[in-house]
Amino acid sequence: MDINEHIQLWKAEERIAHIHGWDFSHIEDRYAEEELPWDYRQIILDYLKPEMRILDIDTGGGEFLLSLNHPHENTAAMEAYPPNVELCSRTLLPLGIDFRPGTGKKPPFEDTGFDLVINRHGDFNAPEIYRILKPGGLFITQQVGAENDRELVELLCGQTEPPFSEQYLSITSQKFRDAGFKILDAQECFLTIKFFDVGALVWFARIIQWEFPNFSVDTCMNGLLNAQKQLEQNGCIEGRIHRFLLIAQK
């Protein structure tokens, strides 16, 4: 395949890059991440009891929340991204789940209303989490760290400022301590992510626009050509993911 054919394929991926909820199935067999050293879902299930009232902040399309199989009458969720708000309104509300549009900075829920608040890769505000939790309530979060995908971003887009420069476990833990929480568990890791074709990386970069600012095939052509060379030399395009886990108790 010559380079012009590659470019046409990359532009095709660019055109179709969209997402419902948080569904990466389009590139499922075209990239791979190392497994995290913890199981976020299992950690939640270890704490969860049917009588608990739970809230999922930044629920995406609600897919993960529904996988917990928690009683719907004790389940609440919130989301700010308009396409996902529409999706959740269609899927969660008819089930009896208390879904409300809103951001993690100011959850639209009453004081001391929840036994457990969960948040995977979403926004949060430690004092607000404290406000909506019952005494003894738990906050469990898995977060994307400040250094996530930085090698890939620099490969395609050059030097850019990280979008969330304070996203480190140490900084986040201190914010929760300052808000009055006790830290029960705190873990952080840096793991490998690999892409097996450049088109998959194009789709990925278009989806995660906040990490890859102003990315397009045309504006980042030199970076994409370098990515293609790296792929041909190494069999993959490699970067790092940055994640951390925090469990805090009110």
How would you name each of these model-derived features?
Residues 145-163:
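Short, glycine-/aromatic-enriched active-site segment of Class I SAM-dependent methyltransferases
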Residues 124-140:
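A short glycine-rich, Lys/Arg-flanked "PGG" loop and its adjoining helix->strand segment in the class I
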Residues 182-250:
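Conserved Class I S-adenosyl-L-methionine
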Residues 19, 24, 31-53, 63-67:
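Conserved alpha-helix/loop element of class I SAM-dependent methyltransferases that forms part
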Residues 1-25, 34:
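N-terminal, positively charged/glycine-rich alpha-helical extensions of SAM-dependent methyltransferases
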Residues 53-107:
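Class I SAM-dependent methyltransferase SAM/SAH-binding core
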Residues 157-171, 212-214:
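Acceptor-substrate binding/catalytic loop of class I
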Residues 105-116:
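A short acidic, Gly/Pro-enriched loop at the edge of an enzyme's catalytic core
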